Amino acid sequence: MKWLILVLMLGCAHAPATSSYFDNTGRDDASTGGVRLIPITTPKGTFNVWTKRVGNNPRIKVLLLMGGPGCSHEFWEALDSYFPQAGVEYYYYDQLGAGFSDNPDQPELWDLARYVEEVEQVRQALKLDHDNFYLVGISWGGLLATEYALKYQQHLKGLVISSMMSSIPAYNDYAKRVLEPAMDPAQLAEIQQLEADGKTETPRYEELLMPFYMQHVLRMPFEKWPWNVLRSFLTLNRKMYVMMQGPSEIGASGTLEKWDRFDQLKTIVTPTLVIGGKYDTMDPDYLEKMTHQLQKARHVVCPHGSHMSLYDDQKIYTSSLIQFIEDVDQGRF
């Protein structure tokens, strides 16, 4: 009987935490299921960006930055299976020009510095601060998160740079030294010829890229790629992607081509997780080197993962992400 009473007491003790996580009392987004459109001021006018909150935790609030540039938030939806159980409050967010957000189709707005200011405006609107704000970005989102931290780290409690080197020149060097030599020479030559001829919007170009993508972007047969990943790609703002990144994931040739912040990483004192996959398009050794440059950092390599380790090494990726957040929250980092 005493054992039964103890079990019931423990169950009751856990219940308030669970119920509080789903408590929307006083939330102005309760009637929309957590969705909120945030007006963003830009040099070209004011536009709305889409966000959606999941959960309620005053101590831990995670803003998710998607990659691309130009992809939408759906990629992150796998976290629905993990974050609620860990009590993590998190926010989906489509950047301007992507997904459910406004797309003014003005290339002047596809600018890194402007996107940093956009993230800051989103932070202010969502009332995230140094006591609870974790910024998580993958690929281009990791680049954007790095740039944000360099300017606004006073607002951050934790930073996650996922599958993103802090130097595009170093990324391009890795692509030339390691990634391209491992490709089929005939296919690589045809890819490069199509790029030289300006024929990167053709089915043949996409067909030639798929073996590389299934090796280094998401290590699954294409027919098994999760639907939410495909949706994120299907809604890709291709014009933005090509302008900023270039036509493919084999290096970068767009307006971000000369971006390099490695030397500035030492100024970031925010606790940081640098995470990537063993088979990533991003050099795992370089990611480790970044952690030595940062003031307070941890490096995780997902041993079965690629650029999207959230899907091809999901348990390692999600457990590492949650462990980092909990360690920072509990003062163990």
Tell me the role of every PLM-derived stretch.
Residues 24-48:
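N-terminal cap/lid segment of alpha/beta-hydrolase-fold proteins
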Residues 95-136, 140:
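Active-site loop/oxyanion-hole signature of alpha/beta-hydrolase fold enzymes
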